[in-house]
Amino acid sequence: MTSRIVTDKAEPGSPEWLKLITASKIPSILGISRFKSQFSLWHEMAGNLPSEPIGIAQQDDFDYGHAVELAAGEYWRFKNPGWRLSRGEVQYTDDGFEFGNAATIDGRASRGSLRRIAEIKTARDLAEWGDDGSGEVPADYAAQVIWQQRVTGFTAPANIVLWPQYGKPKIYVIEYSAQLAAAIVAAVRKWNASLAASEPPELDDTISTYETVRRLHPEIDGREVQLDPDLAADYLTAVADDKEITKRLRGLKTRVLDVMGNAQTAVVIDLKIATRTPGRGDSISLRSNTKADPATIEGISA
């Protein structure tokens, strides 16, 4: 076994850390992250983006996360009698890989010679976490855990303890898949080759990529640049369409909220359409069920 505990851990955001393949980077490498695009991660790892200092709000989120880990760890212990759980994170690396790598696990569970991983995640609620009611772990988080299982060698079923701000905690189980792990490693090797060849991924329409392009060009030098006519026409058309769509969507949200009153969930028969959730301060947010197909409710008389 070529896995070992790392005693001199690289700090997240440091130049050393940026060069490592870590669990948090796996979803972006695979193109399944809901938060960071392939384009954004590539330029971060290539060193093309200036590091951003941790803001007060972000630090507060980190502090909250650390506090939650303590409570979630105790909850996991109650639900897994006979098992021990490490107090704090443990980082591993696999020296069998030809590239720098790390897997930092929130908790190392042990019972005798048995070992398994216990991860802790926070979210406002199950919907924000990504559970559509099926009880399945979102693909990006599942990929992270499979990477952790591969690097640590702890291939027993892992747990993710979800600690929502609203509702009770929930424990998910992630089964190890050697086939998926091999596919992830192959994708990582292809990713590293693109970095070595200075070949970034193509642009996409994610917020992450949009913000990255803005950060890549922070200066204004006064030059004039010629746009492709098709690109220019598409851009101006989309701007006009966006104004109309935004206005229409706002009106429809208003009507849905008005019908809902103080209700939590809006449905058609038994199909969930939208949910009212607590927002910032005293505000209320309306979350749509994006997985609902409008075609399935056409012609239904509610």
Regions found by a protein language model. Give the residues of each.
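Accessory terminal regions of nucleic-acid processing enzymes
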Residues: 1-302
